[in-house]
Amino acid sequence: MRGCLQVLRWLSTSPARRPVSSGLRLRSYEIVSPSILRPFTSTVRRQAQASRNVSDLEKRIAEIPIERFRNFCIVAHVDHGKSTLSDRLLELTGVIEPGSNKQVLDKLDVERERGITVKAQTCTMLYNHNGEDYLLHLIDTPGHVDFRAEVSRSYASCGGALLLVDASQGVQAQTVANFYLAFAQGLELVPVLNKVDLPSADPERALEQMRSSFELDTDNAIKVSAKTGLNVEQLLPTVIERIPAPVGDHTNALRMLLVDSWYSTYKGVILLVRVFDGEIRAGDQVVSFATGLKYYVGEVGIMYPDQTPQSVLRAGQVGYIYFNPGMKRSKEAKIGDTFTKVGYEKKVEPLPGFEEPKSMVFVAAYPSDADHFEHLEDSVNQLILNDRSITVQKESSEALGAGFRLGFLGTLHCSVFEDRLRHEHGASILITPPTVPVKVIYKDGKEVTVTNPAHFPDEDEIRAKVAELREPYVMATLTFPDEYLGKVIELCEANRGIQHTLEYFTSSQVILKYELPLGQLVEDFFGKLKGSTKGYATLDYEEAGWKASNIVKLQLLVNKKPVDAVARIVHYSQVERLGKQWVTKFKEHVDRQMFEIIIQAAVGRKVVARETIKPYRKDVLAKLHASDVSRRRKLLEKQKEGRKRLNAIGNVVIDHSAFQAFLSK
């Protein structure tokens, strides 16, 4: 207590006459020069330096009119070098140190491990062109088809895009898909060839593919190497000259679009926003058009490349905000929502939102230990805040306990989510094989979409009440060298595909379009395609409606009792193959018991595959004399009766690890 009083007395004195202390003993007052006074810690000095840098940055941004803003993104096929090119642009504008080569905008651990972009990330850059400062907003988008929703949301914040093509691989399936998405949004496209320094690069072939596939003027295409930085300095002047400035007026009422959101333990929900009109500052009260809820803004800022606070965000800017008190419920942050200031709700037209992506692949997720369900629930809720395309429903299984039915856009989307649960949240989980939704059309006209095999109608109900069963189809676009054409067609036909078109867009490259059941696509079709073409094929797909199909529910029975967690909806042609796989694999992981265990795969009442696990058998004849036939027969009959009673009342004990091993690939 005495020490605290001494410190308070010391703080209350004027800086020039504070005592020079040693430990807690106070000496006589001495005159201290202000020039040699030091801050309490080095942290204070660092924060002061940071605030000076932020104010310098703000001052430059404040002097730039909206006519010198440019919002653009980079779109391409997966692994064509988008994130590496983003790094070079950030180096060029001084946002990061040269040579860091860290893929700064890939912020998730799973992105760095897999070398793919999963979440669209934004960064603000300042660039001086012809003696004038320009404010550039770069958005690095994913390339994989499963993250198409991320790409389309990014386009809403952009005026143009760099269409990036690998000079060694040329135009590929997702290049085509991303081009049409950007074209439909009316974006100005700048063709860019990457990896021109590779020995295998063929720029002329790639440019010809871009001309023939997209009808783009490639005379002014920029040939770069994101890895070495070759010609990267030509990109930003081209962006400034060709991509239009955003339209908006900072003097109008605030109109702000919610583009993305993520969760912070300390700040609550953080929102990534694009300001279309007006301006927003800390302390403003805003209202959501979607929910009607009102919030006070706690902080606004830009990504530079990390969160950098600013005093204001103006029309045309892309930045982040969070509220104080924070938005704590993830459901309040609706992607595509419009915000305005309180009092202007009737004067402002809400912006058109985004089309909600539909989940097309479903899995069940259970904690490895039933006691960890709450931890799994918290982890899932935090991750879906950052990815709204995932649907979540609670469900329960007799075998595996409480869990979730999760819906995803595709199998890679599911795999990435599983990795994030394990690595970022330490969750230990069981994931069932992916299934796709099916439609049940009843005779009375009612239509039901079934995403959980447990809700699929049984055989009797189908015969009595159901008019038709339908499964989803996709239009798959495959590109590959023509030498593999026969193998790819064979693979597509084996997966119940319907051929639509076959085109050569170069003398050796083929674009093949097939209509395929989505259920076949999620069963490692891409892996088989890569195997058939030695890794040279690329795949993109889009929804193609629903078709009538002969689909059934395949169940696993253990001693004639169904194991609910392992049921699947499949086409009838797959029943026998899958059934044999199931019973053989499940037998490997179930321990022997004191009674016989019968493992069956069945469709309705029809058993399609069976395996038997023999019981332990005690040698009851070990102590008998060889000639004692009647006693021998009596003991064997007694053992046989005991086994019958066990079979009637015995419950099969299946260890949790058996399900874990069975569900693992």
Swiss-Prot record:
Q: What GO MF annotations does this protein's record show?
A: GTP binding; GTPase activity; mitochondrial ribosome binding
- Check the record and name the NCBIfam families matching this protein: lepA, small_GTP
Cell location: Mitochondrion inner membrane
PANTHER family referenced in this protein's UniProt entry, alphabetically:
TRANSLATION FACTOR GUF1, MITOCHONDRIAL, TRANSLATION FACTOR GUF1-RELATED
The reply to whether GTP-binding figures as a keyword in the UniProt entry is yes
GO biological process terms on file: positive regulation of translation; translation
The UniProt keyword set, sorted, is:
GTP-binding, Hydrolase, Membrane, Mitochondrion, Mitochondrion inner membrane, Nucleotide-binding, Protein biosynthesis, Transit peptide
Q: What is its EC number?
A: 3.6.5.-
* Transit peptide residues according to the UniProt entry: 1-53
* Family annotation (InterPro entries): EF-4 (IPR006297), EFG_III/V (IPR035647), EFG_V-like (IPR000640), EFTu-like_2 (IPR004161), G_TR_CS (IPR031157), LepA_C_sf (IPR038363), LepA_CTD (IPR013842), LepA_IV (IPR035654)
The tr-type G domain covers: 67-247
Of which family is this protein a member?
Answer: Belongs to the TRAFAC class translation factor GTPase superfamily. Classic translation factor GTPase family. LepA subfamily.
Species annotation: Talaromyces stipitatus (strain ATCC 10500 / CBS 375.48 / QM 6759 / NRRL 1006)
Q: What is its main location?
A: mitochondrion
Instruction: Enumerate the residues binding GTP.
Output: 76-83, 140-144, 194-197
What's the protein here called?
Answer: Translation factor guf1, mitochondrial
Membrane topology designation: Peripheral membrane protein
User: Which reactions does this protein catalyse?
Assistant: GTP + H2O = GDP + phosphate + H(+)
The enzyme's main class, written as a single word, is hydrolase
